[in-house]
UniProtKB/Swiss-Prot annotation:
InterPro entries: BTB/POZ_dom, SKP1/BTB/POZ_sf
Pfam annotation, one family: BTB
Protein origin, superkingdom: Viruses
SUPFAM superfamilies: DPP6 N-terminal domain-like, POZ domain
Family to which this protein belongs: Belongs to the mimivirus BTB/WD family.
Disulfide links within the chain: none
Name of the protein described by the UniProt record: Putative BTB/POZ domain-containing protein L107
Protein's organism: Acanthamoeba polyphaga mimivirus (APMV)
Domain BTB: 16-87
Amino acid sequence: MDKKKLFQYTLDGKFTDLELTLVDSNDTLTMHLHKVILSSSCPYFETMFSNSFSDSVSDKFRMEVINVYVMADIINSFYITDIERSQNLSEVDYQLLYTQSRNFLGLEHKIQNLEKIIFPENKFDKLLDTIDSCIGYNKETISILFYNMPMDYDLSKLPIKLLKKMSKISRYFILCIDSDRIELHNNHSCFSIGPVKLNYNCKLYKLLYSPIYHKYLMVNDTIHLIDTETDLSRISFDNNRYYCTNAVLSTDNRYVYSVYTNSTIRKFQTETTELIGVWYRDGMPIDTVNKNQGPITAFDDRPKKIMYSTPYDYIIVQYGTSLVCYKCLDMSIHWEMDNVHLPTLSQCEKYIVCLKGITGNQLCVIDIEKDSLKFGPILANCRYICNHDNTTVIIIHDYKISGSKIRVYDWVNNIFTYENESFNVSDITYIDHIENDNYIIVSHDIIDDSYISINKWNFKEDTTKLVTACYDNYSHKFYTITNFKAALQKRIKEYIDTNSN
């Protein structure tokens, strides 16, 4: 059966056996259709044309619907897949009506259509009503609700049972680039944020999220900004000769500081992406018009990491094995330090925990304000140092023969408080702390190196739970953690604690 030819017959009014008139509160639309196509594609029409109802259905039928044009699109999709929308609605309004209309017809729901949309605050109640009346609450729909819920939403509108499920299901998100788009994953949904401009010659990307301005930023040879409320994007710094190796937001989210392959530091406004200033490694300013000038930096001395210290308004940049601390006020150098490896900013942002020495094997704590050192134990085969809480870090050792060891180090009291030797870290490409004893790890499959898995890992229980997985077809992909719903999570938890019996 050639459905495309049959669809053309519906347009021409030829060889059809049903005249279906769709009626809503504003419009009426008549379609000439084939009963066999409708009944084979849709439970609603299959029941209508069954023996028990066939006597009441003639060759003409009037059907009251929510929106005649959206319903017509769904019916036309029974014939062809590449249909053009018959009404000029916003994507938000269209998908809500589309979901409601499919539910009316008894068709399966296409939840992925809702995941692709950022719902504005004034549409959240409609989203909630649509999910409540049409789909129901499951892990995917609760995740969609949490993702789109306004920060100041009246939580009393939602039952405690639903809020408890919401607090359990959506604790963290992973931001990544996939097929020229920015996507946000949690363990139940994949939300499409928007398209990005990729330079495939550039292997270095940094993804940031500003919870204050509700914007995503992708920093490479350009600055690509996406507004989550309007879904509009802006690109700055075109034709930049050098690539960003790392970037960080100031605590107030007003500025982004980024470091580039020519060892320059750049500062720009988050809200407008306007370039504020460019500085050499020694803190000397560069004319922003000539921002691409600068010395060619040896690969081993290029900037690797940039950290922001909130209490002191400093940025600390790692160049090769050197650390340089700058005052954000005037970008003057506060201190410099050599032979530093694996620097990690403490949770209180007043200290840096790292490895020190020419061989890079002695644990050391740097007081950022006082430029003082506190030395700890000698370590062997240290692979990662990860911030854990205000006084401890996770240290991961990689032993080629005997496997791996996880240790928790209390740098205030200079003692190890925990050890675990069962986890294999040899294939980890990224690790970051989420909460309590839980971390996110990104790793390549041992057999198929192109296969990437992102897992939630509890280091004390030595358990992992898959969050998402994909094939890394391009080396430019980068993953990071963004807990941009932390404030809402806190509100929900406080509301549950206050209102639970």
